[in-house]
């Protein structure tokens, strides 16, 4: 069986872009960069446990520590994507959405029942931007450390919304890491049976997740997603 690779799909029928190098060439136009990072051996027991149960708060804290990103690491991720930090020197490293736990945090698929998954899919699946009231965005780094597959969406300069398919991460295998700007339209669809994402976001102290920003680049695409059918009982990811 051939191992799945990072794949970028186009809704207009263009051939998919496959492989990390080719995908990054396309996504760099909107400040997005994908990479792989080794999984530390000491993480293996937690990653294995996450296949069958939700992690405890202590295990989540351990996981964040094992996949920690310091200020210099976060700035390096921005540079790899061809961006400059939204806030000088990276800003606050524990930014938060109003009323929501601050970053860094762990998204654990086993911690969600079906109803919770559907709510998350509806919330994150619609294209959105993460900004302050003054329009300052956050810088985001998502690392899929186990499970999957996972899906992200980005809007290209020509207005096309592309689907980025991130393959399954096997226990002990390299993690997939995505760096992208929160101020550009993006989304995610999390439907894996199990999987862990170590999530970092930084910049302004607080931000708001927005589905309507008339002045934002690509604002017409916000609150929609051509790759997801929101009309049924639960959001459904569409094929090409």
Q: Residue spans of the language-model regions?
A:
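Intrinsically disordered, low-structural-confidence terminal and linker regions
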Residues: 1-23
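General structural signal for secondary-structure boundaries
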Residues: 19-22, 155, 172-174, 181-182
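Active-site region of the double-stranded beta-helix
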Residues: 27, 32-170, 190-240
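Extracellular beta-helix/beta-solenoid repeat scaffolds
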Residues: 174-194
């Amino acid at each position: 069986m051939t191992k799945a690779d990072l794949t970028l799909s186009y809704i207009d029928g263009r051939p998919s872009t496959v492989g990390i190098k080719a995908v990054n060439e396309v996504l760099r136009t909107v400040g997005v960069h994908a990479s792989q990072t080794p999984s530390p051996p000491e993480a293996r027991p937690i990653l294995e446990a996450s296949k069958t149960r939700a992690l405890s708060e202590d295990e989540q804290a351990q996981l964040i520590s094992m996949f920690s990103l310091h200020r210099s690491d976060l700035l390096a991720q921005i540079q790899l994507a061809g961006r400059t930090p939204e806030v000088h020197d990276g800003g606050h490293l524990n930014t938060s959405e109003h009323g929501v736990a601050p970053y860094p945090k762990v998204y654990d698929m086993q911690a969600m029942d079906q109803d919770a998954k559907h709510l998350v899919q509806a919330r994150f699946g619609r294209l959105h931007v993460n900004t302050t009231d003054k329009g300052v965005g956050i810088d985001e780094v998502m690392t899929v450390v186990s499970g999957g597959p996972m899906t992200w969406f980005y809007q290209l300069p020509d207005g096309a919304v592309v689907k980025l398919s991130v393959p399954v991460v096997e226990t002990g295998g390299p993690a997939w890491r995505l760096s992208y700007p929160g101020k550009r339209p993006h989304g995610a669809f999390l439907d894996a049976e199990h999987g862990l994402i170590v999530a970092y976001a930084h910049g302004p102290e607080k931000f708001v997740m927005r589905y309507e920003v008339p002045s934002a680049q690509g604002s017409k695409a916000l609150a929609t997603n051509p790759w997801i059918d929101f009309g049924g009982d639960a959001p459904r990811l569409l094929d090409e």
